[in-house]
């Protein structure tokens, strides 16, 4: 399946949740739907930007023994599948917290990510002023570091983040944590316009987007829709259905992605 028109979709799964195999099938289903990007979250014990749904999934993955090496194995397998199956492969993004990268070893992490077909990295808590040379090393290995712009930051801060973020900018739709519903209203549109005034890179809007009605209202406003809890919540629901075949599992995630975006499942 080739990538769909704007707004594009950035999906999200938790590596190892509810199992290694299930997280792979979930990822493949989202990719087959036509997602242009996929965040593969490496669980971290203190995910300060995440809401209850993602935090619980991360904790379960860690309790089951998740290791960074398993995350890379998942990405390597996923990369092989999507490069084989898709004319326009989904861009794979590792989403994790800075301490996990630092603990693994920055250059070792970047090199392994590159070997596994990773396109970019999002570390929500990574300060742009003190990244321990992560951006320099990532650039050396052609890995993009995507930065976040949160509400209520200054204009100068918006400009600085927009400049340093590679290729796209992740814009946080509202204050708070992931998963809580975001109201699509005048204030949000004004926030998006403010970013666009000072940033010419494509905007990925995330936090609390979980319905087609929200996506439709944002259609001409942003370039990329980021949906995290929307997928993780659905994956949690499917985890109780042990009789699902891998093919059924992938198809359900594919349909769930297409329902959010208003894409025809037969396209």
Curated annotation (Swiss-Prot):
The active site is at 39 (proton acceptor), 50 (proton acceptor). Disulfide bonds: none annotated. The keyword Lyase applies. One of its GO terms (molecular function) is tryptophan synthase activity. It comes from the Bacteria. InterPro entries: Aldolase_TIM, RibuloseP-bd_barrel, Trp_synthase_suA. CDD domains: Tryptophan_synthase_alpha. It catalyses: (1S,2R)-1-C-(indol-3-yl)glycerol 3-phosphate + L-serine = D-glyceraldehyde 3-phosphate + L-tryptophan + H2O. One of its GO terms (cellular component) is cytosol. Pathway: Amino-acid biosynthesis; L-tryptophan biosynthesis; L-tryptophan from chorismate: step 5/5. Signal peptide: none annotated. The keyword Endoplasmic reticulum does not apply. Keywords: Amino-acid biosynthesis, Aromatic amino acid biosynthesis, Lyase, Tryptophan biosynthesis. Its EC number is 4.2.1.20. Belongs to the TrpA family. Tetramer of two alpha and two beta chains. The alpha subunit is responsible for the aldol cleavage of indoleglycerol phosphate to indole and glyceraldehyde 3-phosphate. This is Tryptophan synthase alpha chain. It comes from Helicobacter hepaticus (strain ATCC 51449 / 3B1). The gene is trpA.
